[in-house]
Amino acid sequence: LFRPDGTPAAFVKVGLGPVADQLVATEAAALAAWARHPDPRLVVPDLLAATTWNGIRIAVVAPLPEDVRRLPPGTPSAWAVRDLDGPPSCAALADAPWWTRRTEREGDGPVRTLLEQIGDRHADATGSWARWHGDWVPWNLARCHRGLVAWDWEYSEPDAPVGLDEVHGAYQQARIVEQQPIAAALEVARLAAERLVAAGTSPGSPAELRRRAGTDEVPSPFPSARWLADLHLAMLLTRSTELERLAGTPPHDRAELLAAAEAGGRRR
């Protein structure tokens, strides 16, 4: 929406169809949560209204700051997002609500088999879980005089694996910007997980500094790079299944995703 003078007044998101309806609902809930617990490290557009019209869900979101500028190359850390629901929690995979939500929704089939393999592989690993943005990519991020700006929260979710935003951001850039096939993009995500885990245990990292100060028994929020890469794959698989359930037809790249996931599991 634009004012008479041509300046933006709001972005209006309309939930036409089951998929869009869920995305609009998710974004409205995330923005409402952010309004209750704002963090000065991140600038998030205000939720102006969340309503329905003839049964169609609508979210009205404030425009971006006037002085937003494109980010330099690279993906910034998502630490501010992780604190939205309070400090990250620690839990084994089997006890994590994020994992339970995924396994409970899956019936029999190849995705169920892949999830069981991931669950068995990391049964004894304890990781950190917190809010994630869901689409932490350069085209949803910018800078303004107040700091980092983030919008498009349609895939945000609580209790996600810490680090998922950065790993999925690397995957999305490989797929969308570089148009790499899924198998190659998964390899990019795996390398991003390795870099993140290495940085998370390096001297001077937040986790290492807390450990040295005696305030954190866990030296890193990531049990391993493979843990993070595998949970990213689980997210992709279950997101694809959920989109199929809502739309009534599988996403166009579902077969490619399953093939890449099964091939990757055989190689590891």
Question: What spans do the regions from the language model cover?
Answer:
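Regulatory N- and C-terminal appendages and interdomain linkers associated
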Residues: 246-268
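All-alpha amphipathic helical-bundle segments outside canonical DNA-binding/catalytic cores
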Residues: 220-233
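Conserved hydrophobic/aromatic residues on the N-lobe beta-strands of protein kinase domains
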Residues: 11, 58-60
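ATP-binding glycine-rich loop module of kinase domains
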Residues: 1-25
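Active-site acidic catalytic loop and adjacent metal/ATP-binding pocket
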Residues: 1-3, 120-164
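Active-site activation/catalytic loop segments of kinase-like enzymes and analogous catalytic loops
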Residues: 164-218, 233-248
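Conserved kinase catalytic-core helix
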Residues: 27-44, 57, 64-104, 108-139
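Short beta-strand micro-motifs within the conserved protein kinase catalytic domain, predominantly
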Residues: 46-55
